[in-house]
């Protein structure tokens, strides 16, 4: 089974990917964590690292090339990244999930995770980061990140907690592939 999980920052993709990975005993590969680690290794904020990635396409292209290779060659995995669903284009039987949540909810989650000082500061950084990413995806791949038509499931993580969202996804997944 191959599952991709995508969504904007703070939507809950990493949490839900971990839960899906644990439940179905699938390997988890998270590009978001790779990107955060790369920013931290350089002593940069995500916004600053994103701005650097705008000027240096090799950062995104390397991450995305790696994702594409993984989804095309490896079974039994959850691939979590903003573009995971797009990277799975042409691969049969991949379940593509998009997790969404309103901007203010996502910013509150990011603020808790990143331990930032000011909500307004985090809001500005998140908006800037999303603009930066959308621009890069459009320029590099012609992808409109707001077009959710490629996804099999789109679910709002604000309406349910992570375990309820997992339960909803499990029902959908089990209906497609049968219970594990």
Swiss-Prot record:
It is found in: Cytoplasm. ATP binds at residues 7-15. It catalyses: CMP + ATP = CDP + ADP; dCMP + ATP = dCDP + ADP. CDD domains: CMPK (cd02020). One of its GO terms (molecular function) is dCMP kinase activity. Keywords: ATP-binding, Cytoplasm, Kinase, Nucleotide-binding, Transferase. GO terms for biological process: pyrimidine nucleotide metabolic process. InterPro entries: Cyt_kin_arch, Cytidylate_kinase_dom, P-loop_NTPase. It holds the Pfam family Cytidylate_kin2. GO terms for cellular component: cytoplasm. Belongs to the cytidylate kinase family. Type 2 subfamily. HAMAP family: Cytidyl_kinase_type2. This is Cytidylate kinase.
């Amino acid at each position: 089974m191959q599952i991709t999980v995508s969504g904007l920052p703070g939507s809950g993709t990493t949490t839900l990917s971990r839960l899906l990975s644990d439940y179905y005993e699938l390997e988890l590969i998270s590009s978001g964590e790779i990107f955060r680690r790369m920013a931290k290794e350089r002593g940069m904020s995500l916004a600053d690292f994103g701005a650097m990635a705008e000027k240096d396409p090799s950062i995104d292209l390397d991450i995305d090339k790696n994702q594409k290779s993984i989804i095309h060659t490896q079974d039994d995995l959850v691939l979590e990244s903003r573009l995971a669903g797009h990277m799975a284009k042409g691969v049969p039987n991949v379940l593509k999930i998009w997790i969404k949540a309103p901007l203010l909810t996502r910013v509150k989650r990011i603020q808790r995770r990143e331990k930032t000082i000011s909500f307004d500061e985090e809001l500005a950084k998140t908006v800037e980061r999303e603009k930066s990413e959308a621009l890069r995806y459009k320029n590099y791949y012609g992808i409109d990140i707001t077009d959710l038509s490629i996804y099999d499931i789109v679910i709002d993580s604000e309406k349910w907690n992570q375990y309820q969202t997992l339960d909803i996804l499990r029902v959908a997944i089990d209906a497609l592939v049968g219970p594990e």
